[in-house]
């Protein structure tokens, strides 16, 4: 029980004081004069000049008031002065009224230790459990506060925004990889089967052809160095790849990708792209039977480049809320996905800077591989640029879906190509043997005629016909074999995977999906944070007056010192450990008041 003096003077009993001895709320003042003026302006129920307090020994301090109990029904607060404390004002709660007789009432009270000693105790750095904090910085950006509140926020999210981002808009790249070159370099004679080793991130022996195209089947205008190139349609490119003799069975991989590992200059409105002539060259794949196919050949790439896509303000699209913490995880989350089984969740507050930027990396490998990472995510400011780039890989979406285009193995073309020389040799041999057989039989017939042997002449003539007939039959048999092969259905040696589904349905690049908790829970949590602030869990000086209307403060084993008795000091510590709202404006308890940071 708080210490009570033996007597008091200038006792004033008030009504309409809006807080009680549960110490959930109190009025917090900047000066003793402001404090006195506040209470002295309250409606007076009764005034006593001098009185002695009774019941102190029993722990039930009270005064006798010469007034009917009905006249004191609304008495809730009392102040008095004591000459032993330099005329200090003591502030008290009226706790109970007791009927004595028709003209006398016992008024029980207890000392309001907060108001009585408000300017006599001081906080030292203490462990702050929760309090009202600064929510926004000078640029109106939410300050990071992700301490778990332990509150229910529901089990489902509302999707508030879905945006698709592709490295080059509608532009895609078909990458064709062959065992050997399928074209002749300008000024040189084409050599089938020529291995063209080069640098593609690393030394390698394969030949790479890059064919840009759009969803509608058209192709962009391409500039390589200073030369303009109009590449063929993707369908024409594919058609020729599987009909030209030196291309059949030469292709080892064929896939579609959004990014080839180079931050090329691309103008989406003009549908033009520019490539460096040190890396690429314009080529024509052709033979003597089919039209030329304009495409792009990879000469050399020593190092790949990343491309940065700025998706805009990281907190855009989320519901406006005066509570900045509701923009933090888990109340808001951004998901980056390609809808192909690759997905990462991003906590927006850990993205350095105001905008969410995605870094795209890729390559011209034997299959598709593109990564999408969040720039400067969880990256300390002490890291260098290259270190930040590497660190972002830890939070990347890796799309290594094959995106293959089906490769057709035309058995007839392959047979003709692989056996071209032997087939010609067989034909020549058959014809030569047939002719020689005819000549031999012809000489035999002439000899028989010279000797007058009619049987010999007839036999040799029959041999001539037989030799010629056998040659024709052998050639016909060889052609029949080719016809049988031609009737064999073309086989898929490499399936197209889900490329048609993914690209046909527009699943390209990545999607940035913003999600937040349901409105019901947003409202519940907003009201809670508005009333009780945020968890702090820091040793610091408490925020006793940082808001316009009220501050909530809760401590643990708080460190308070002051020039007052130890019993009251301990009670003050207990009050702050239990949590109390310090009101700076009236009406006390009105949470609709403007409570902006001051």
Swiss-Prot record:
Q: Which family does it belong to?
A: Belongs to the picovirinae distal tube protein family.
Work out whether the entry's keyword set contains Signal. no
What task does this protein carry out?
Distal (knob) tail protein that plugs the end of the tube before DNA ejection and forms a channel perforating the host membrane during ejection.
| Lineage, top ranks | Viruses, Duplodnaviria, Heunggongvirae, Uroviricota, Caudoviricetes
Species source reads Bacillus phage Nf (Bacteriophage Nf)
On the tree of life, the source organism's domain of life is: Viruses
Keywords, A to Z, come to: Late protein, Pore-mediated penetration of viral genome into host cell, Viral genome ejection through host cell envelope, Viral penetration into host cytoplasm, Viral short tail ejection system, Viral tail protein, Viral tail tube protein, Virion, Virus entry into host cell
- Biological process GO terms, please? symbiont genome ejection through host cell envelope, short tail mechanism; symbiont genome entry into host cell via pore formation in plasma membrane
Q: Which GO terms describe its cellular component?
A: virus tail, tube
- Protein name as annotated: Tail knob protein gp9
What gene codes for this chain? 9
Subunit arrangement?
A: Homohexamer; forms a hexameric tube structure with six flexible hydrophobic loops.
Q: Does the keyword NAD apply?
A: no
Location(s), subcellular: Virion
């Amino acid at each position: 029980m708080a210490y009570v003096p033996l007597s008091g003077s200038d006792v004033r009993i008030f009504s309409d004081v809006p807080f009680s001895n549960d110490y959930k709320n109190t009025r917090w003042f900047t000066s003793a004069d402001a404090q006195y003026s506040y209470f002295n302006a309250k409606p007076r129920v009764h005034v006593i000049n001098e009185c002695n307090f009774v019941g102190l020994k029993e722990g039930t301090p009270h005064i006798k008031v010469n007034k009917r109990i009905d006249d004191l029904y609304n008495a809730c607060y009392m102040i008095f002065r004591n000459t032993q404390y330099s005329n200090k004002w003591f502030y008290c709660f009226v706790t109970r009224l007791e009927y004595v007789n028709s003209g006398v009432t016992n008024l029980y009270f207890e000392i309001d230790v907060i108001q009585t000693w408000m300017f006599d105790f001081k906080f030292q750095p203490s462990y702050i459990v929760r309090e009202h904090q600064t929510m926004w910085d000078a640029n109106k950006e939410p300050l990071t506060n992700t301490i778990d509140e332990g509150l229910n926020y529901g089990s489902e999210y509302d999707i508030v925004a879905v945006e698709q981002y592709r490295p080059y808009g509608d532009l895609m790249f078909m990458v064709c990889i062959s065992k050997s070159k399928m074209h002749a370099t300008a000024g040189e004679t084409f050599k089938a089967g020529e291995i063209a080793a080069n640098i593609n991130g690393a030394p390698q022996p394969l030949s790479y052809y890059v064919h840009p195209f759009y969803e509608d089947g058209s192709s962009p205008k391409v500039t390589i160095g200073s030369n303009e190139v109009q590449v063929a349609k993707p369908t024409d490119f594919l058609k020729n790849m599987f009909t030209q003799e030196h291309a059949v069975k030469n292709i080892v991989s064929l896939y579609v990708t959004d990014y080839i590992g180079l931050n090329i200059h691309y103008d989406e409105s003009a549908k033009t792209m520019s490539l460096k002539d040190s890396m690429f060259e314009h080529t024509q794949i052709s033979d003597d039977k089919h039209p030329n196919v304009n495409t792009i050949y990879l000469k050399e790439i020593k190092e790949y480049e990343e491309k940065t896509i700025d998706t805009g303000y990281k907190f855009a699209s989320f519901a406006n809320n005066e509570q900045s913490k509701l923009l933090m995880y888990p109340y808001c989350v951004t998901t980056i996905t390609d809808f192909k089984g690759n997905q990462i969740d991003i906590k927006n507050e850990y993205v350095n800077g105001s905008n969410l930027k995605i870094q795209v990396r890729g390559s011209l490998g034997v299959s598709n591989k593109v990564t999408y990472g969040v720039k400067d995510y969880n990256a300390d400011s002490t890291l260098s640029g290259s270190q930040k780039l590497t660190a972002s890989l830890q939070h990347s979406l890796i799309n290594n879906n094959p995106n293959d285009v089906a490769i057709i193995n035309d058995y007839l073309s392959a047979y003709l190509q692989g056996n071209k020389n032997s087939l010609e040799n067989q034909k020549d041999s058959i014809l030569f043997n047939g002719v020689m057989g005819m000549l031999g039989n012809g000489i035999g017939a002439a000899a028989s005629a010279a000797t007058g042997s009619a049987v010999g002449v007839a036999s040799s003539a029959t041999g001539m016909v037989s030799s010629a007939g056998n040659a024709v039959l052998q050639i016909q048999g060889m052609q029949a074999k080719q016809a049988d092969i031609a009737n064999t259905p073309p086989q898929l040696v490499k399936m197209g995977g889900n490329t048609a589904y993914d690209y046909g349905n527009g699943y390209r690049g990545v999607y940035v999906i913003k999600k937040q908790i349901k409105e019901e829970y947003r409202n519940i949590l907003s009201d809670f944070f508005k009333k009780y602030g945020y968890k702090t869990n820091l040793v610091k000086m408490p925020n006793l007056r940082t808001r316009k209307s009220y501050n909530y403060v809760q401590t643990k084993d708080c460190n308070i010192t002051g020039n007052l008795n130890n019993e009251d000091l301990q009670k003050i510590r207990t009050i702050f450990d239990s949590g109390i709202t310090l009101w700076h404006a009236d009406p006390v308890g009105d949470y609709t008041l403007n409570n902006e940071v001051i």
